[in-house]
Amino acid sequence: MKWFFTFASVVVLLDQFTKKLAVLFLRDRGTVTIIPDWLKLTYAENNGIAFGVEFASQAIMILLVGSISLMIALYVLKSGNRKTLFLLPFSLIFGGGIGNLIDRLTVGRVIDFIHFDLYQGTIMGSWVSLWPIFNVADSAITIGACMLILLHNRIFPEPDTKAENHVR
């Protein structure tokens, strides 16, 4: 469990540090362009979840994120699996959840600032922005979830049926 919490702590510290920098340098400045027409830093406060979707009050969001984080930690603890390939994706998701939970508890919403400007304009008469503004915690959650999907067979290998058949 030491590595699980170590990885998660790194995510939380990096997330909170970058959010403090965003508050300090971006909140009153607007947008800072890093790579023209592609990457910007834009301060935003998000009351919802992914893509700004709001579906519940902050109290319910805090309860939901806290419960999911607790379930992840308990699952990893009870699994007994201490392989890095197993711990890393769960610690990224856990750390990202805790990072955003800290924002909800202290600020009342999540601070976002990384903005990929893939396309902004009108489609069929409606203004659209094809990529949300996000943060380090969101990135960690997404990377952890992608690892679980893409590496599923390596993280959760099937039991060797040949070995089981020989035991009988």
UniProtKB/Swiss-Prot annotation:
Its EC number is 3.4.23.36. It is an enzyme of class 3 (hydrolase). GO terms for molecular function: aspartic-type endopeptidase activity. Keywords: Aspartyl protease, Cell inner membrane, Cell membrane, Hydrolase, Membrane, Protease, Transmembrane, Transmembrane helix. The keyword Hydrolase applies. The active site is at 112, 138. InterPro entries: Peptidase_A8 (IPR001872). It comes from the Bacteria. Coiled coil: none annotated. This protein specifically catalyzes the removal of signal peptides from prolipoproteins. HAMAP family: LspA. This is Lipoprotein signal peptidase. It comes from Chlorobium limicola (strain DSM 245 / NBRC 103803 / 6330). The gene is lspA.
